[in-house]
Amino acid sequence: IASCLVGSEMCIRDSGKAGAEPEIRVRGTNSINGYKPLYVVDGLFNDNINFLNPQDIESMEILKDPSSLAIFGVRGANGVIIITTKKAKEGQTRVNINGSFGFKAITDKIAMVDADGFKTLYNEQLKNEGNPEFNFTDWTGNTNWQDEIFQTGFITNNNISITGASAKHSFYLGAGYAYEQGNIKKEKYSKVTLNVSNDYKVTDNFKVGFQFNGARMLPADTKSVATALRAAPVAHVFNEEYGLYTTLPGFQKAQMNNPMVDVELKANTTKAENYRASGNVYGEWDFLKHFQFKVVYSMDYSSNSTRKYTPIIKVFDNSVEGKVETLGDGKTGVSQEKQTETKVQSDYLLTYQNTWGEHSLTATAGFTTYYNELELLGAARTQGVGLVIPNNPDKWYV
C-alpha cells in the first residue's frame, strides 16, 4: 500500500522487514500519536491499514493542510489518509484473477572494516584509554556479518475478485493471499484477506448496504540488523569441530550474541497470529429533492496472540573450560500474550445539495460517536527442576 503513496509529498520509510508496517509521515511529528497519520477506511477511524489488500482499494485521499484538523480534530493533527475500498459498479458480472511475484535484495550494504582493520582500531582505542592491547591470538576470523544474515527475499501476491451489479443490487467479493520472505534469513510473513460489499436499492430514494474487510496474518519473527553491524569481524561464524556457533570476544559477548545465534538458533521460536475484522452497515435516504440523510454503523475488531519460546542455547567459547558455554540461565521458558481491541463508530450525516445555473452548493452536518476498548493479557513461566519445556509449539502455553 505504501508504494501507492510514493510521489505524494510524504515521507515514506520501509524497514524492509517482512510484513512490517511502513513509517508514513504526512505532517511531520508531534507529541500526540507521534508521527502516524489517521487512517479513515470506509468512514471508520483506524491507526493502521496492514489488514487491507491493495487490490481492494478503490481510492486514497490525503489531507495534510488545516482541513485535516477542521474535520477530524486533534486526531488529524498528523494528517489524514482517507481510503475507500472497492464496490461493485453497474454492469455484467466479472471475475478478475491476478498474481505477481518478485525478489528483493540488499544492494548497498554498509561498509565495515575487515578483521585486521578492526584489530588495529580497537587496540588504538585501548591505548588511548591507557589499557593494554587485547590479545587476538584466538580470534582469527574475518567475517562480514551482513553477508551471513542477509538473503535475497521473495514476495508474491495473488488475488481474485467477483463483481456484479444491476439497477437495484450490486455486490463485490475479493480475496487475496500474500507471502513474503524477508531479506534476513528465516523471516516469513503471510496474509489472507477478504473484502465483501453489498448494496441494495429498496426504493428510488432509499438504499441500504454493508461493507466487510477481514484478514488473517502470520507476522514474521523479525530479527535485528544492529547486531550484525556491531559484532566484531574477528570471530568465526561456526566451529566445525564442536558443531556449534561461536561466541564473540570477551569485550562484546556480555552485550550481544553471535548474530547467527539469533537468526538460526532462535528462528521459529515465536508464533504469532493476528486476526482483523472491520465493516459497516448503512442506510441512505433522499428526501425533499435536495436533502440526503445517511446513517452508518461501523465496527473494527482485532485479536493478536503471541507465544514465545526460550530454548537452551550452547555456543563454542575458547575462553572457558570445556570450550562450550550455555547462554543465559540455561533454562527453557515460554511467554504468552493476547491483545484484543474493539472499535465501534456511528455516523449521522445530513447533506444538502442544490444547483442554480453555473453555481452549486453542498452543505453537510454530521454527528459521530466513537468507542474504543483495549484488553491485554500476558504471562510467562520457566522450566521446573529438570522439567525441560519441549521445543514444540503445541507445548508453548503458560
Please tell me what each predicted stretch does:
Residues 1-7, 11-12:
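Single conserved hydrophobic/aromatic residue that forms the stacking wall/gate
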Residues 9, 43, 60-61, 81-83:
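Non-catalytic regulatory/gating segments with a bias toward low-complexity or hydrophobic composition
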Residues 9, 31-33, 46-48, 66-71, ...:
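Short beta-strands and strand-coil junctions in structured, solvent-facing domains, enriched
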Residues 13-20, 52-55, 72-77, 187-190, ...:
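Short, glycine-/polar-rich solvent-exposed loops and beta-turns at beta-strand/coil boundaries
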Residues 17, 89-143, 168, 182-189, ...:
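Surface-exposed loop/interface segments of Gram-negative outer-membrane beta-barrel transport/assembly proteins
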Residues 42-70:
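Short acidic/polar hinge/loop motifs at secondary-structure boundaries
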